[in-house]
Amino acid sequence: NGEIYAMVNVPEFDLNDPYTLNTTSSKNMSDKKKQEALNGMWRNACVSDTYEPGSTFKVIVAASALEAGVVKLEDTFHCPGFKVVEDRRIRCHKTTGHGSETFVQGVQNSCNPVFMEVGARLGVDNMFHYLQQLGIMSKTGIDVPGEASTIMHRKENVGAVELATMSFGQSFQLTPVRLLSSISMILNGGTRITPHLGVELESSDGTAVKKLTYPAQENIISSQTSETMRMILESVVSEGSGKKAYVEGYQVGAKTGTSEKLPRHSNKYIASCMGFAPADHPVVAALVLIDEPQGIYYGGTIAAPVISELLDNALPYLGVERGETVTAEPG
């Protein structure tokens, strides 16, 4: 429903001592470098910084394609390890190819050629229609300052290559809170939500004075598409690239991502994973980003275990018992 339980940026800092760097030693830093480090530490990257989402964005594209009726679960695709789009040879992360696979397997494998084909089926008009419908093109309206806007191609400038790269989450940027908010609309049955930290106003003695309300809109996508996407994303954990997001006793859905930072070929990446649970009736969703990891940089390897740990702690705290089927509305 948009209520934010936690929002964390690392490194953190002590509000009582904001000028002390909570990083490596600053003794050898110039004043300029120290100020840059402080500014970075103070920024709320979840809201104020944009990034290329990579394969976590495939949740948006998959839901759009299902809603538009341009793809069915049993549709088959072929991945030779790349796809030629105009004069570009755009590769899959599995350079030897996934071979023949269904649409569901394409999501499980996070296969770029499958999503380039799905994006082509959607077309530019449909793609931008659903980006608008799912809120990608606008700010979330979160109740904290400094929210950044999505940086997206102008529709009239999108050709086949741009459409292909957009389809697997590259060549544009958005904020983490924007992505998770839009994915939440897909998971919650199709209701547009406003992410928020504030729940109610209280008097000095703790008495509730006013319950805060936020804009919401139903039927952004169909409940059938929502249910189908939850099923597909649960299979990403049980059968696909999100196995390390598994939490014993819970049905977890997830989508991993690995995006290369600009400039390309700099060997700098953002590893990410979005996860939610219980998969059949979600009560909580989370997004983890690891900026410029050293060594292994795949989201399924290093970000998915963080999602697993988060959900393993959050679900019991929220009163969801292991093995329990949730029947109440998501909270």
Segments from the language model and where they lie:
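Ligand-recognition elements built from short beta-strands and adjacent flexible loops
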Residues: 309-331
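Beta-lactam-recognizing serine transpeptidase/beta-lactamase-like catalytic domain environment
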Residues: 3-55, 60-290, 299, 320, ...
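Short alpha-helix boundary/capping segments
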Residues: 221, 295-306
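Small/polar-residue-rich segments within soluble enzyme cores
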Residues: 288, 308-309
